[in-house]
UniProtKB/Swiss-Prot annotation:
The active site is at 145 (charge relay system), 221 (charge relay system), 254 (charge relay system). This is S-formylglutathione hydrolase FrmB. GO terms for molecular function: carboxylic ester hydrolase activity; S-formylglutathione hydrolase activity. The keyword Hydrolase applies. The gene is frmB. It catalyses: S-formylglutathione + H2O = formate + glutathione + H(+). GO terms for cellular component: cytosol. Keywords: Hydrolase, Serine esterase. Serine hydrolase involved in the detoxification of formaldehyde. Hydrolyzes S-formylglutathione to glutathione and formate. It comes from the Bacteria. InterPro entries: AB_hydrolase_fold, Esterase-like, S-formylglutathione_hydrol.
């Protein structure tokens, strides 16, 4: 991994690395925050998945998470949201193609050549983190919007691998809303059964479980009713007896003003779980 940015932050280092991804067949950037104790001991890892139009920069520059990651001694890994490059398929819209990988493995041309974000986040990136950084095997996952969807899917499909999961404003029923339907039709085809592998509410209804889910949702979020539908997640978790910490916030929208307001509580939540044995 090639170091391309290095910034001192709260006694640690906010770095950005570039590497070639075998899963995605392109060069990828990834943000890695190394807290002060990373120089002396191995630490647990929180993976953060960003939302539509984002890259690795949004979370590391806008959330203020470094203060809390330093306090709780957690390495934070923030990858890009899709494969990148002039040779990678793209679309002339914000919710498909580059910047909109949806953390799935595409099966349809032209997307299936590079869009294997599920494999990248689940397999390749954790292997690289273990090879290059002082990380323990204990990891948690979180994200925002499309990234909240990805975090929930990865945790639900791999409950023994992630200690905890949380999300800000996640797309909880992508097979039922325009963002998900349009992306899934392009990436996965018209067989809607295939869509359900990447739909948190559907996965839970099929019996996939995690110990607990934490979600924060702003009630002034323009996408709340049409695209996100947080109450669907709350309802299915109640039906399936999955513990939740779902909080609704008056006045907060879909932006990083919202994420930055509560990211400290999410990192503390994950730190508590990661440090339990």
């Amino acid at each position: 991994m090639e170091l391309i940015e290095k910034h001192a932050s709260f006694g640690g280092w906010q770095n950005v690395y570039r590497h070639y991804s075998q899963s995605l067949k392109c060069e990828m950037n990834v943000g890695v925050y190394l807290p002060p104790k990373a120089g002396n001991e191995k630490l647990p890892v929180l993976y953060w998945l960003s939302g539509l139009t984002c890259n690795e920069q949004n979370f590391i520059t806008k959330s203020g998470m470094q203060r809390y990651a330093a306090e709780h001694n957690i390495i934070v890994v923030a990858p890009d949201t899709s494969p990148r490059g002039s040779h990678v398929a793209d679309a002339d819209r914000y919710d498909l193609g580059q910047g909109a990988g949806f953390y799935l493995n595409a099966t349809q041309a032209p997307w299936n050549e590079h869009y294997k974000m599920y494999d990248y986040i689940h397999n390749e990136l954790p292997d690289l983190v273990m090879q290059h950084f002082p990380a323990t095997t204990r990891k948690s996952i979180s994200g925002h919007s499309m990234g909240g969807l990805g975090a929930l899917v990865l945790a639900l499909r791999n409950p023994d691998e992630y200690v905890s999961v949380s999300a800000f404003s996640p797309i909880v029923s992508p097979s039922q809303v325009p963002w998900g339907q349009q992306a899934f039709a392009a990436y996965l085809g018209e067989n809607k059964e295939a869509w359900l592998d990447y739909d948190p509410v559907s996965l839970i209804s099929q019996g996939q479980r995690v110990a607990e889910i934490m979600v924060d949702q702003g009630l002034s979020d323009d996408f709340y009713a049409e695209q996100l539908r947080t109450p669907n997640l709350e309802k299915i978790c109640q039906e399936m007896n999955i513990k939740t910490l779902i909080r609704y916030h008056e006045g907060y929208d879909h932006s990083y003003y919202f994420v930055s307001s509560f990211i400290g509580e999410h990192i503390a939540y994950h730190a508590n779980k990661l440090n339990m044995r």
